[in-house]
Structures are given as structure tokens and as C-alpha cells.
């Protein structure tokens, strides 16, 4: 996965340890929170299989989970709605939903998460990854076995 999942107006919470804005408990934040108006289109950052789409029953609210090649998975949380269905295939850039304020959320945003073999990695490293800086990702993200 690479590139931006949506147009956004800033990062409200980066990847890493933080004090949770609702519970007040210090814990790992496994993604990046991107501020956006409710209803902003959200796009797949890589082609893949829709593993889950709908109400998560957890802090994610309405959630889309995509499974990608090479052990990658992306999660898109707090959506106002999902427009994909489990079992379908999406291409990079396909519309998958709209940003929202569902689940444990303090305002409209997208929680964007990338996992490699089940382990969370910093999405910011992948959001700026492109053909011009292709080799940089292997040094920026040491938690992925690139060979």
C-alpha cells in the first residue's frame, strides 16, 4: 500500500504511543488519524480483497479491512459508510467508503492503519512512498522484511 487514502486537513494523532483521547489511558495507537470533513471519499491504497466492511462493534466504528499481497493489510476506521462488500476485489484508487465519526471518535476523521504479517507499521512511511523514493521505504520501515 502506498499513497494517500483521502484528501485530509492534517494529522490529529500519529502512529505510536499516546494517551487515548476518550479513555485517558496511555496505549499504542496502531494507525494514523487524518482530519477530514464527514463524507470525504476514502480510497484503497492498494489492490486487494475486502476482508470486512461494516460495523466493527468496537472502537473502529464502521470499518473496512483490505487484505493485500505479500502479507499487507489496511484498515480504514470511523467511516460514515462503506461502499464495498466483503469478498469483493478492489483496485488501488477505488472508492471504499466515506470518512465519518463512528465508534470511539472525538470528531470526523479517518483512522488509517497498515499491518504487515499482523504487525502494525507506521502508515506515514507508506503515504509518501512513490516511484521517486522507492528505495527509501526499506530504511524507513524496518518492521517489514523487504527481501
Give the residues covered by each predicted segment.
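Acidic, glycine-rich catalytic/binding loops that coordinate metals and/or anionic ligands
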Residues: 35, 85-94, 113-147
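Surface-exposed, glycine-biased beta-strand/turn segments
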Residues: 1-60, 92, 142-147
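Short hydrophobic beta/alpha edge segments that flank linear recognition/processing sites
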Residues: 34, 63-64, 91-103
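Glycine-centered loop/turn positions within well-structured domains
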Residues: 32, 40, 74, 82, ...
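Zn2+-dependent peptidoglycan hydrolase active-site motif and core
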Residues: 27-29, 44-83, 108-109
Amino acid at each position: 500500500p502506498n499513497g494517500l487514502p483521502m484528501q485530509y486537513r492534517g494529522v490529529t494523532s500519529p502512529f505510536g504511543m499516546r494517551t487515548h483521547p476518550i479513555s485517558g489511558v496511555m496505549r499504542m495507537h496502531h494507525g494514523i488519524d487524518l482530519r477530514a470533513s464527514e463524507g470525504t471519499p476514502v480510497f484503497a491504497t492498494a489492490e486487494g480483497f475486502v476482508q470486512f466492511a461494516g460495523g466493527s462493534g468496537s472502537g473502529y466504528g464502521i470499518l473496512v479491512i483490505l487484505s493485500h499481497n505479500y502479507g499487507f493489510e489496511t484498515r480504514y476506521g470511523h467511516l460514515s459508510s462503506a461502499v464495498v462488500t466483503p469478498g469483493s476485489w478492489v483496485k488501488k484508487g477505488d472508492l471504499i467508503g466515506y470518512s465519518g465519526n463512528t465508534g470511539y471518535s472525538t470528531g470526523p476523521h479517518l483512522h488509517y492503519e497498515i499491518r504487515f504479517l499482523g504487525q502494525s507499521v507506521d502508515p506515514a512511511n507508506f503515504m509518501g512512498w512513490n516511484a521517486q523514493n522507492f528505495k527509501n521505504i526499506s530504511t524507513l520501515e524496518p518492521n517489514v522484511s523487504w527481501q
